[in-house]
């Protein structure tokens, strides 16, 4: 099911937004070039919110320990993380961000 997250203009390029869906937190990321990605908002190395991290066009970096994750796949690209994080399909319709999410 596609869930509406926010207006595209509410998410600035190079930033991430933490969104709670029930007990599950997602990081909705807008890259500096304007692409929008969605992934679990928890570093696989620890209980750290990725949405507070550093965003570039291909990765998000955990602010606490520096683990980087590929935005398209959730694959860890640097230690200390070695487990991937889940990613979710993003849809943009009428300048609104939606995420495909099944509970």
What are the functions of these language-model segments?
Residues 16-103:
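Rieske [2Fe-2S] iron-sulfur-binding domain
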Residues 1-8:
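Short amphipathic
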């Amino acid at each position: 099911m596609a869930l509406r997250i926010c207006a595209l203009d509410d998410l600035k390029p190079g930033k991430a937004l933490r969104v709670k869906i029930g007990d599950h937190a997602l990081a909705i990321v807008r890259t500096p070039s304007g692409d929008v990605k969605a992934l679990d908002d928890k570093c696989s190395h620890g209980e750290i919110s990725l949405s507070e991290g550093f965003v570039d066009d291909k990765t998000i970096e955990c602010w606490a320990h520096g683990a980087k994750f590929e935005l398209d796949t959730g694959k860890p690209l640097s230690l200390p993380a070695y487990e991937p994080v889940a990613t979710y399909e993003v849809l943009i319709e009428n300048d609104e961000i939606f995420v495909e999410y099944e509970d």
